[in-house]
């Protein structure tokens, strides 16, 4: 038997109250009848606690040097490396495992392992994403399924309940900060506790001399032993609410494209102003655009708005009510693309402008103003094109600020696909009466020619829900089945009927 305690508040379907128990049996609270949030079906007891975004979030110390998880500094890592058994955080009894997304520069290639209780593995972002079906559409770059995660734990011999896992960039860059975030997100989503998980602040080119000296680096990484025995099924936190499905996002959008203060949500687009506006406005330097003297500029005469499109999409723009501030503002390029201080991130999220004038803007392309961004009690929804850039805004929100945060993992590559607009075959991607049309709740500009629009893999345009990824993850933890990777997986029946 599995006992499941749902401590989450909210009314979304995609992972908030709906949980697939053993054999897809119905929870009374989700399917009607009864008053409890636990499955008491018999047998040995296994309690899985469903965590709300507010419980998953963690607030960083004002000074990152004081953190022992979440955002950690090179100085903290140095203390651990010098005497791991003596200096490891309270509650950690296992190994120190560093996942580097890339090789660092010459002389600082890898955080130096001792291969006894400190290990460093090269683990690119491709290991932490997977093409998945949500029951409606096949979407790239989603959180990996259970079998994929277990294969990673086996490959690197990770004990996620006892080891300290540090996601690092290697060479610091915007792309590697995204990869670092994907590592953190996948592990946290699957139930690794905050105390066991950290992100190293800054790339190797900067931390070499700023917290670590040259002796702390090695030219080679540890060899993956492929001897791990622990499964994500042993992790008893259900953190699937960290992911927002397209259904969840549709359910929280306002009735028009405006910033609604006090509605309990802040939706943050991590992309450029050009992508947010579908080319109606640009940022200085965007697409080689020369600065206009401000932070939001009208495009030059004759500008081709299709330059803002990605992944051969049918349209470009944003969901109604979204605020935009590009992810790069969260990082300090002079410090190996480390996160900026917490106070600066708090100011950005409040709506305040920085010294250069960059701030959250709304659908009018005007700054919302200090105090009109994040509101206490809001849940922050973050996205970009494939939720790589949004890993940085999401970490800023969830790991630094400690705000309840959900990652729309399907992102704009999924959102813009769910449209009654033609692809290169001339056929609309979704039928006019599909309930999953996101074009009806979006500002957008259609692709200039359907010939540029790639075909999408639609699984079921009339699916009852779009939470197959969530259900599969919850079911896998209970010992049922695998995942939706690869192609066109058949949507499982609704365990509650209908």
Question: Where are the predicted features?
Answer:
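N-terminal secretory signal peptides that target proteins for export/translocation
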Residues: 1-14
């Amino acid at each position: 038997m599995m006992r499941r305690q749902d401590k989450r508040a909210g009314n979304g379907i995609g992972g908030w109250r709906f949980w697939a128990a053993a054999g897809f049996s119905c929870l009374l609270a989700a399917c009607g009848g009864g008053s409890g949030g636990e499955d008491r079906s018999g047998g040995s007891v296994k309690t899985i606690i469903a965590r709300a975004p507010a419980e998953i979030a963690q607030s960083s110390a004002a000074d990152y040097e004081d953190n022992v998880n979440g955002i950690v500094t090179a100085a903290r890592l140095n203390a651990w490396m010098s005497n791991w058994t003596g200096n490891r955080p309270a509650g950690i009894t296992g190994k120190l495992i560093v996942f580097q997304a890339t090789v660092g520069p010459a002389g600082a290639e890898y955080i130096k392992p001792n291969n006894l209780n400190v290990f460093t593995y090269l683990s690119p972002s491709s290991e932490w994403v997977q093409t998945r079906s949500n029951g409606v559409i096949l979407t790239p770059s989603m959180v990996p399924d259970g079998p994929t995660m277990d294969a990673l734990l086996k490959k690197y011999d990770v004990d996620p309940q006892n080891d300290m896992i540090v996601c690092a960039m290697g060479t610091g860059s915007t792309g590697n900060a995204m990869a670092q975030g994907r590592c953190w997100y996948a592990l946290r989503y699957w139930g690794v506790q905050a105390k066991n998980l950290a992100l190293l602040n800054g790339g190797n080119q900067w931390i070499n001399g700023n917290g670590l000296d040259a002796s702390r680096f090695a030219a080679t990484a540890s060899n993956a032993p492929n001897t791990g025995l622990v499964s994500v099924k042993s992790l008893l936190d259900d953190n699937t609410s960290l992911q927002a499905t397209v259904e969840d996002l549709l359910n929280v959008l306002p009735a028009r494209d405006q910033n609604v203060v006090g509605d309990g949500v802040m939706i943050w687009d991590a992309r450029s102003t050009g992508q947010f506006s579908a080319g109606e406005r640009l940022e200085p330097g965007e697409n080689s655009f020369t600065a206009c003297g401000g932070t939001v500029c009208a495009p030059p005469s004759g500008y081709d708005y299709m330059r803002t499109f990605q992944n051969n999409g049918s349209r470009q723009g944003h969901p109604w009510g979204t605020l935009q501030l590009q992810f790069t503002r969260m990082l300090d390029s002079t410090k190996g693309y480390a996160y900026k201080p917490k106070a600066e991130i708090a100011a950005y999220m409040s709506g305040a402008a920085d010294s250069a004038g960059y701030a959250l803007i709304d659908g009018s392309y005007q700054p919302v103003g200090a105090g009109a961004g994040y509101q206490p009690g809001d849940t922050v929804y973050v996205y970009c094109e494939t939720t790589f850039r949004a890993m940085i805004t999401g970490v800023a929100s969830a790991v630094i600020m400690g705000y309840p945060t959900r990652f729309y993992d399907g992102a704009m590559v999924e959102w813009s696909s769910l449209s009654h607009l033609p692809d290169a075959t001339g056929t609309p991607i979704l039928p006019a009466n599909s309930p999953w049309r996101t074009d009806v709740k979006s500002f957008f500009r259609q692709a200039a020619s359907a010939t540029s629009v790639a075909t999408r893999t639609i699984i079921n345009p009339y699916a009852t829900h779009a939470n197959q990824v969530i259900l599969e993850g919850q079911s896998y933890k209970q010992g049922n089945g695998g995942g939706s990777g690869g192609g066109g997986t058949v949507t499982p029946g609704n365990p509650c009927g209908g």
